Curated annotation (Swiss-Prot):
It catalyses: 3,3',5'-triiodo-L-thyronine + iodide + A + H(+) = L-thyroxine + AH2; 3,3'-diiodo-L-thyronine + iodide + A + H(+) = 3,3',5-triiodo-L-thyronine + AH2; 3-iodo-L-thyronine + iodide + A + H(+) = 3,5-diiodo-L-thyronine + AH2; L-thyronine + iodide + A + H(+) = 3-iodo-L-thyronine + AH2. One of its GO terms (molecular function) is thyroxine 5'-deiodinase activity. Residues 68-304 are extracellular. It is an enzyme of class 1 (oxidoreductase). Its EC number is 1.21.99.3. One of its GO terms (cellular component) is endosome membrane. The gene is Dio3. The lineage of its organism: Eukaryota, Metazoa, Chordata, Craniata, Vertebrata. This is Thyroxine 5-deiodinase. It is found in: Cell membrane; Endosome membrane. Monomer. Homodimer. May undergo minor heretodimerization with DIO1 and DIO2. GO terms for biological process: apoptotic process; brown fat cell proliferation; hormone biosynthetic process; positive regulation of multicellular organism growth; response to hypoxia; retinal cone cell apoptotic process; retinal cone cell development; thyroid hormone catabolic process. Plays a crucial role in the metabolism of thyroid hormones (TH) and has specific roles in TH activation and inactivation by deiodination. Catalyzes the deiodination of L-thyroxine (T4) to 3,3',5'-triiodothyronine (rT3), 3,5,3'-triiodothyronine (T3) to 3,3'-diiodothyronine (3,3'-T2), 3,5-diiodothyronine (3,5-T2) to 3-monoiodothyronine (3-T1), rT3 to 3',5'-diiodothyronine (3',5'-T2) and 3,3'-T2 to 3'-monoiodothyronine (3'-T1) via inner-ring deiodination (IRD). Catalyzes the deiodination of 3-T1 to L-thyronine (T0) via outer-ring deiodination (ORD).
Length: 304
């Protein structure tokens, strides 16, 4: 009897209370997951750092006015002179992509600018959206009533959905808004358009530029973002306008900072524009829409 009791005692001590290994296993899995994320972040930084250094060096060079005037005011030899477009009254209209102008009193290589550049490059590297792949159905917010929706809620059947990401303090975005409005007017019969207001490109308490048409600080709340979006809405084209969430979920999913253009059709990304400011080309969007219109109606569209 004593031997049996001792045997039962040893077995009981070895088993331990049920579920004792559960918290330890969960903690181990969590630690492993965080370690993998840290390794991924470190690897991405190593990949991005040379690109970031190149951009930083270019910004430093552009702070020399003689270099800035030479590079920003010359026309690339591969880009021919744009066609002159006339409106119904025979008046010449501005080009789709007016040249990027930077005033002489603006410094480009600052701590705030480098932070913004790094933020944009990191979002672009980790974005989920890629041309030919599925369109991320990220969350957006309506400016009236703060109702939460999804980007693909604005897609209707097989009609293309054009996404235009940007903010009021982004000079290229605002300078090309009239060209975007012309595309909305021309193609809205067959195509849907959605403007997504994201975090400010040049907030008054961040990377400041005198070329920005508005003085708007960083958004501290959704109410701040709504107020900024209403400024854009007053002069925005006749298409839907929504806000990115304060977690910047749509900007992150689409790598949209500073500004960017996309076309979605049947849940697939058919066109992915370059990241602004250099890659933000309304003329590329026009070309895509002209080709789509030609395929849809079988006639070559006429520019107006």
């Amino acid at each position: 009897m004593p031997r049996q009791a001792a045997s039962r005692l040893v077995v009981g001590e070895g088993e331990g209370p049920p579920g004792a290994s559960g918290p330890a296993a969960t903690m181990l899995r969590s630690l492993l997951l965080h370690s993998l994320r840290l390794c991924a972040q470190t690897a991405s930084c190593l990949v991005l750092f040379p690109r970031f250094l190149g951009t930083a060096f270019m910004l430093w060079l552009l702070d020399f006015l003689c270099i800035r005037k030479h590079f920003l005011r010359r026309r690339h030899p591969d880009h021919p002179e744009p066609e002159v477009e006339l409106n119904s009254e025979g008046e010449e209209m501005p080009p789709d992509d007016p040249p990027i102008c930077v005033s002489d009193d603006n410094r480009l290589c600052t701590l705030a600018s480098l932070k913004a550049v790094w933020h944009g490059q990191k979002l672009d590297f980790f974005k989920q959206a890629h041309e030919g792949g599925p369109a991320p159905n990220s969350e957006v917010v309506r400016p009236d009533g703060f109702q939460s929706q999804r980007i693909l809620d604005y897609a209707q059947g097989t009609r293309p959905l054009v996404l235009n990401f940007g903010s009021c303090t982004u000079p290229p975005f605002m300078a090309r808004m009239s060209a975007f409005q012309r595309l909305v007017t021309k193609y809205q019969r067959d195509v849907d358009f959605l403007i997504i207001y994201i975090e400010e490109a040049h907030p008054s308490d961040g990377w400041v530029t005198t070329d920005s048409p508005y003085v708007i600080p960083q958004h501290r709340s959704l109410e701040d973002r709504v107020s900024a979006a209403r400024v854009l809405q007053q002069g925005a084209p006749g298409c839907a306008l929504v806000l990115d969430t304060m977690a910047n979920s749509s900007s992150s999913a689409y790598g949209a900072y500073f500004e960017r253009l996309y076309v979605i059709q049947s849940g697939t990304i058919m066109y992915q524009g370059g990241r602004g400011p250099d890659g933000y080309q309304v003329s590329e969007l026009r070309t895509w829409l002209e080709r789509y219109d030609e395929q849809l109606h079988g006639t070559r569209p006429h520019r107006f």
